[in-house]
């Protein structure tokens, strides 16, 4: 097979050769350990699924400490250029630089490449230790908006010239008198746009249609923040009705029917929509949602939410099924085709080089990558092997200490077990 070819995109669709070149960022701390295990598992799955007809050619690019030590930069322009050119990449955890400049390398990558969806599927693998009674009821896919909200990075420190100007403008030009302690306040700005909302909700509904999911829930705090989070909810409903028509039934439609014809008619309309296989578009206030994912998780399927809510929700849900050590993630621009698949946990520097930590997060992010390429046969091999390996209680230390009768293995050995269990 040839040395490797570039993935291309035409009309928003990936053209994937049989031997795609995929850039990878090894990651800091435990990054080399987990990448060593994960890359072998992904390669073995592709080999087994396609018997040598398909193969990934990895291309290393640099970010984080490794980049800084090599180039003096935490996120070299060359790395961004390579990912732009090759479209798809996978990365381990990165250290956030101490001091000024880039606040978070992960956020910088998302913003530079406009990766507007943070995709976080949450599902349970039988046998994984969980703090909840029925973790198997949790099966959701989170679409978190990645570029806006309070995480946009528009923030000014207490006492700075910028914050003084901003507070003065708010007080004098807009007659704002709600800043309780203006002399000692830092200020952050929360932009939420109709375009940003629309492309996120569109991606979530498209995913629900493509994967046979039953509902999309818009999670927000619009009861308090009416013109940002409330607008997110309203724009989401408007987009669903305008672009998807009879493929969906929204709670906004439900409310209109209830107002005009009564609740019985609205309930009947929703039941008929469900029976017809339409996707129900609904909403939930964030604090109530965080209760209900514990008390009735099987009522939720695909979730679309803003940046800050999505951060909380993704990690809270991950805890219900075993923690972020086994939580995959991807950052995707569904319009340009660019995507970075990533470990969702930190660098855990105290375990660096010990061949100890659980590589499942980056392995399962690799599964998302394979699915994104359309290589579902290889992705399924990894999932089934993960199910089999965990069910047999052969696990890394983080799970072994919480499981009766477990066999504790190293990071690399867990990868080897996964390869053995592929069938």
From Swiss-Prot:
Keyword Repeat: no
Site (Critical for catalysis): 151, 221
Cofactor: Mg(2+); Mn(2+)
Alphabetical list of Gene3D superfamilies matching this protein: Isopropylmalate Dehydrogenase
Gene Ontology molecular function: isocitrate dehydrogenase (NADP+) activity; magnesium ion binding; NAD binding
Annotated Mg(2+) binding sites: 311
PROSITE patterns, alphabetized: IDH_IMDH
Residues involved in NADP(+) binding: 95, 345-351, 358, 397, 401
EC number(s) stated in the UniProt entry for this protein: 1.1.1.42
Binding residues annotated for D-threo-isocitrate, in chain numbering: 104, 106, 110, 120, 144
Reactions that this protein is recorded to catalyse: D-threo-isocitrate + NADP(+) = 2-oxoglutarate + CO2 + NADPH
Record GO biological process: glyoxylate cycle; tricarboxylic acid cycle
Record key words, sorted: Glyoxylate bypass, Magnesium, Manganese, Metal-binding, NADP, Oxidoreductase, Tricarboxylic acid cycle
UniProt cofactor note: Binds 1 Mg(2+) or Mn(2+) ion per subunit.
Enzyme class: oxidoreductase
Biological role stated in the UniProt entry: Catalyzes the oxidative decarboxylation of isocitrate to 2-oxoglutarate and carbon dioxide with the concomitant reduction of NADP(+).
The protein's assembly and partners: Homodimer.
Other comment: The enzyme can be phosphorylated in vitro by the E.coli isocitrate dehydrogenase kinase/phosphatase, but B.subtilis lacks such an enzyme.
Sequence similarity: Belongs to the isocitrate and isopropylmalate dehydrogenases family.
Family annotation (NCBIfam families): PRK07006.1, prok_nadp_idh
Protein name, as recorded: Isocitrate dehydrogenase [NADP]
Originating organism: Bacillus subtilis (strain 168)
